Amino acid sequence: GERDYGVGPVPAAALTALVCAGLAAAVGARPELAVWLLLVPLGVLLTAVDLAVNRLPDVLTLPMAGGAAVLLGAAALLPHSAGSWPRALLGGAVLGGGYLVLFLISPSGMGFGDVKLALTLGVALGWYGWGVLFVGAFAGLLLGCCWGAVLVLTRRAGRGTAMAFGPFMILGAGAGLVLGALGAG
């Protein structure tokens, strides 16, 4: 049957529209905007799912990673694109590899869904450069760690409590994309 992910269709659509409008304002009429506008609804959906069930399903994360790589490859062929497709692919490998190392060090501390999500976010952030990749990835880690600290300090969670980390990764990557787009403009 249907599953309730805690966010109704109207708030999810409003959030998606707001994020798309912000990215459109930052990116302008460049080819990569179409890619970001296709990825945003998936990011919002992944955020809702992860917050509800602490899981990032393969049915969303894997096609999202492949789609981002292929679509940015097409965007790179068009005039006025502001990024680098080879660097985007390397960014996916670097961020995905970094999260894989974190997962291997502590499988109970990092879900494998986060590793797969990192592939997509690395591709997207890598498009605009290594600095953008670092800022977006670090912002996600910092936001997640701060939220985890708040939960522990308010005794709403302990050190071993599972926490949805994907939403923070996505939020950090979104901030990185906006900064990258503005810097490329």
Regions found by a protein language model. Give the residues of each.
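A membrane-topology feature that recognizes alpha-helical transmembrane segments
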Residues: G1-G185
